[in-house]
Amino acid sequence: MRIGLALPTFGPDATAEGVVGVSRSAEELGYDSLWTGDRVLAPTSPSAPYPVGDGVMPRAYERHLDPLLSMTLAAAHTERVRLGTSTLNALWQPPLMLARSLTTLDVLTGGRLDVGLGLGWMPDEYAAVDVPWQGRGGRLDETLDILHGYWTHDIYAHQGPLFTIPETVVGLKPHQRPGPPVLLAAFTAAGLRRVARRAAGWLPVAMPLLYLTGLWATILHEAEDAGRDPSTLRMALRVNPALTAEKAEPERIPDAGTLEQYIDYARAAAEAGVHELFIDLGQSPLTLEERTDMAGRFIEGVRAG
């Protein structure tokens, strides 16, 4: 199983020094990948609860860096690790602009890009960027169509229900062909079908492994029904540790636990067939130095298992 680490793109350590420092440390520690998230607002009165825990949005989101620009900085200070988004909201910019940005990143990183796309959870952000909250699934499908077309055609045009692209020469191609892998965050039945039929893989969040493997089995079954080879799909699991000083009850894992319990969870995830697991320590009260030390102990513990 590959092991990744989230960059400090949220909170007080969302700085150039933070991004560069974690990037270099991750590569030195043997991490396989670095990941960024996406926010455009931190509303004082959100219209929807945060979908995890007590429903309160983490204070770290009040300070947020652009995920793709942060990834560019990380790429400039690393040579080996892959660079992924978990998740980039697929609908907050026109698909053609998204295609150009992702293609540029894949070229500049030498083919180290993993594109993780999602739809978000907060209508406020959609209002702020003037994108309708309703009809997100159809908008995502058309966005995926445009990404694929832009990456695979020398001459490309698109006429769809939402977007029109006049015929154009596409001279810049991704380093990875036919394009960087696109993974989707999804939990509804329709979303899981979209992963199975259209994506290179799935971006779930940490949950009990029995439930996780059940959802993954659903995706693989749908992929086979669609005529795809299920073995070509991969899963990259996000874990946001809520660290406790004392050992948590087993039923609380992975919602809370000690570092050792999260190491055990990661080992069990590997045995359950998870292809990649990455941890995001950005919501902890620890200093950046303490989180870097913890990241070192985490990967050492998982690799030793």
What are these language model-derived features?
Residues 1-305:
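Active-site-adjacent structural elements that line small-molecule/cofactor binding pockets in enzymes
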